Amino acid sequence: MCGIWYSSGFSDISNKQLEIVSHRGPDYSNMIKMSNSIAIGHNRLSIIDLNPRSNQPMFSKDKNHIIVFNGEIYNYLELKDELEKLGHVFYSTGDTEVLLHSYLQWGKNCLHKFNGMFVFLIFEKSTNKIFVARDRFGIK
């Protein structure tokens, strides 16, 4: 199980937040500071696509959207195929990138397409907006 977090409004953001949830993901940890008071962090437990290209936080191709994700999208291969037919290009083989592309394609309506257990946060740098969602049953 991975660990994700988002911090806003605190001027003292440090790697301490990553350390607190390090037991949730021993394979990789990273924090992205957007400003002195906004940060996104992720502790990874590698399950799908063990390659470092799937480390998080993960950026969209244009670097405007950043995602942190915990869980599993069971139908991600079907969604990936649908998105590729719509012109999306993927650089990893995991479900995190599929989730991000789904949001970029369908916005909040992407939630109706996911079959799985998940919690994720997407930060849009150009607007400083966040989108946070979890699975229907609150497993994650």
Features from the language model and the residues they span:
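N-terminus-centric sequence/structural signature that marks the extreme N-terminus
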Residues: 1-140
